[in-house]
A protein has these predicted regions:
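Generic structural marker for isolated residues within well-ordered, non-membrane alpha-helices
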Residues: 13, 24, 53
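Residues in the helix-turn-helix
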Residues: 37, 47, 66
């Protein structure tokens, strides 16, 4: 069997953060949570909820099914404008 859904979500988030050049603090601000909450979810100490997955997909400009398909598909679905090195609008509360 392949990876579990929680692992797939954590890996997709990590891959998207890397591809977009986004920090945990920036992602936390966009989702309205603390950086510590993002860290706990990424370490597996807490789980990403389905509502979180939907918010993450919206934040990264993709369909939630592409996001849930795992890191490879999620990165393929990431819009060019959100990729690292591209100019993207700042996220509410993000410090640049």
């Amino acid at each position: 069997m392949g990876m579990s859904l929680p692992e797939r979500v954590r890996l997709a988030v990590a891959a998207l953060m890397h591809a977009s050049g986004e920090s945990q603090a920036g992602l936390a601000a966009a989702l309205g949570v603390t950086q510590a909450q993002v860290s706990r979810r990424q370490s597996g100490a807490a789980a990403w909820s389905l509502a979180d997955c939907e918010a993450l997909a919206v934040h990264y400009g993709m369909d939630v099914l592409d996001f849930l398909a795992g890191p490879t598909r999620a990165c393929e679905a990431l819009p060019d404008v959100l990729r690292a090195g591209r100019r993207r609008p700042p996220v509410k509360g993000e410090v640049r």
